[in-house]
Curated annotation (Swiss-Prot):
Family per record: Belongs to the metallo-dependent hydrolases superfamily. Hydantoinase/dihydropyrimidinase family.
Binding, Zn(2+) 2: 150, 183, 239
Protein name, entry field: D-hydantoinase/dihydropyrimidinase
PTM info: Carboxylation allows a single lysine to coordinate two zinc ions.
Chain's gene name: dht
EC number(s) on file: 3.5.2.2
Cited NCBIfam families: D-hydantoinase (TIGR02033)
Record: residues binding Zn(2+) 1: 59, 61, 150, 316
Free-text cofactor note: Binds 2 Zn(2+) ions per subunit.
Reaction(s) this enzyme catalyzes, per UniProt: 5,6-dihydrouracil + H2O = 3-(carbamoylamino)propanoate + H(+)
Length: 479
């Protein structure tokens, strides 16, 4: 099966040019002007549109067991919704229970993901520590293509990683050539503030952001960055939502530390007023962690993208329907944390970023695809338009528009946190493994078509770290 995209403007993270692109056997086979059409090849007219690398969402949680329930989106429905939005690959999370084998949890998630409609990989969370955890980390890297490990600094009495676990796991990541990632919130402070607010009679969603103020995120970001700096590891911080956390990243990067920041579309576009909505269910629908912040943090995050201190855009796609959110009707701390966004991420970033002049098209490609591929060692297989790369592409109509709504989205959740927002600039066609799976409103996703993608250890940042460590190696004093 082959597909020729004719006459589009190819846009990568570095350049743009007019060309035809031929896809066959799941790969990009040729790029050039006026390519011949092979016998039996389908032809897609790309005139007037941009052809870009398919989106990579580095942060999703499909069918996650969490807070007494299970996320409503499974791996097929979630990746299918992603294809409708231009996202062709995800990196989800394996989250073992404390004391559970990492390998056992990994195989459980692999089983769930077999129905995926798009390519996928996994970060693996470190929720406890032992010699066995260290051994299994090595096996995951060497035999299963895992090159990143997640650490939750929040969720006390559940999956929170204390400092001793952070130190041990970061050190093990360094030995393995893996990237440690963190959810940066001070779990002790969050727990304390939750109990304090509940004792004061604040039980509704409006208390959620009060229990997780920006300082809580800033402190945890600073602590994780200092641990990484001391040990000499890279660090990737997920869903940065506050100016305080961003300032910590900027300060570290100004000193040359390899720290990377991720931001969600929601944190760029929504503010904390949503938690004060008079309808409880509407307000509860926005409960996620970190919470949406006051408006001034949004502008700081946009500046973080523009300055290169934030590197990827994600969704933290973790859907809970209204009935599930109601589990916390009398206690905000029991509202399942999570929102949707995999279908809307790219259109939102284009509309609010490119159309507004905040971002160039090339920055858009970097932030939605290429940077993630580089950080997690998928480039140039993904995140690129070049011969030999995976034929994961999105044909983008800069003049097309749609209104975001639960009534029309493909995400398996009964509300949309961006309800009623109209975006200009949308995917007209999405191509995964050279197959046209989203075509002008027609979703052709196939259960099980997605592949597990192994990510090799030692992404490019380790080249610099290795030389730096050698230069700074301590030398004993001879006496």
């Amino acid at each position: 099966m082959s597909l020729l995209i004719r006459g589009a403007t190819v846009v990568t993270h570095e350049e743009s040019y007019r060309a035809d692109v031929l896809c066959a056997n799941g790969l990009i086979q040729a790029i050039g002007e006026n390519l011949e059409t092979p016998s039996g090849c389908d032809v897609l007219d790309g005139g007037g549109q941009y052809l870009m690398p398919g989106g990579i969402d580095p942060h999703t949680h499909m069918q996650l067991p969490f807070m007494g329930t299970v996320a409503s989106e499974d791996f097929f429905s979630g990746t299918a919704a992603g294809l409708a939005g231009g996202t062709t690959s995800i990196i989800d999370f394996v989250i073992p229970n404390p004391r559970q084998s990492l390998l056992e949890a990994f195989h459980t998630w692999r089983g769930w993901a077999q129905k995926s409609a798009a390519d996928y990989g996994f970060h693996v969370a470190i929720t406890w520590w032992s010699d066995e955890v260290a051994r299994e980390m090595g096996e995951l890297v060497a035999q299963h293509g895992v090159n990143s490990f997640k650490h939750f600094m929040a969720y006390k009495n559940a999956i929170m990683a204390a400092d001793d676990t952070l130190v041990a796991s970061f050190e093990r990541c360094l030995e393995l050539g893996a990237v440690p990632t963190v959810h940066a919130e001070n779990g002790e402070l969050v727990f304390h503030l939750q109990q304090k607010l509940l004792a004061q009679g604040l039980t509704g969603p409006e208390a959620h952001p009060l229990s997780r103020p920006p300082q809580v995120e800033g402190e945890a970001a600073s602590r994780a960055i200092r641990i990484a700096e001391t040990l000499g590891t890279p660090l990737y911080l997920v869903h940065i939502s506050s100016r305080e956390a961003l300032d910590e990243i900027a300060y570290a990067r100004a000193k040359g530390q390899p720290v990377y920041g991720e931001v969600l579309a929601g944190h760029l576009l929504l503010d904390d007023s949503v938690y004060r909505h008079p309808d409880w269910a509407t307000a509860a629908g926005y409960v996620m962690s970190p919470p949406f912040r006051p408006v001034e943090h949004q502008e700081a995050l946009w500046r973080g993208l523009q300055s290169g201190n934030l590197h990827t855009t994600a969704t933290d796609h973790c859907c809970f329907c209204a009935e599930q959110k109601a589990m916390g009707r009398d206690d905000f701390s029991k509202i399942p944390n999570g929102t949707a966004g995999i279908e809307d991420r790219m259109a939102l970033l284009w509309d609010a970023g490119v159309n507004s002049g905040r971002l160039s098209m090339h920055e858009f490609v970097a932030l939605t695809s290429t940077n993630t591929a580089k950080i997690f060692n998928l480039f140039p297989r993904k995140g690129a338009i070049r011969v030999g790369a995976d034929a994961d592409l999105v044909l983008w109509d800069p003049q097309g528009s749609r209104t975001l709504s639960a009534a029309t989205h493909h995400q398996r959740v009964d509300f949309n946190i961006f309800e009623g927002r109209t975006v200009r600039g949308i995917p007209s066609h999405t191509i995964s493994q050279g197959k046209l799976l989203w075509a002008a409103g027609d979703l052709r996703a196939e259960p099980g078509a997605g592949r597990y993608v192994e990510r090799p250890a030692y992404p490019s940042v380790y080249e610099v770290l290795g030389r730096r460590a050698e230069r700074q190696r301590p030398v004993a004093v001879e006496r």
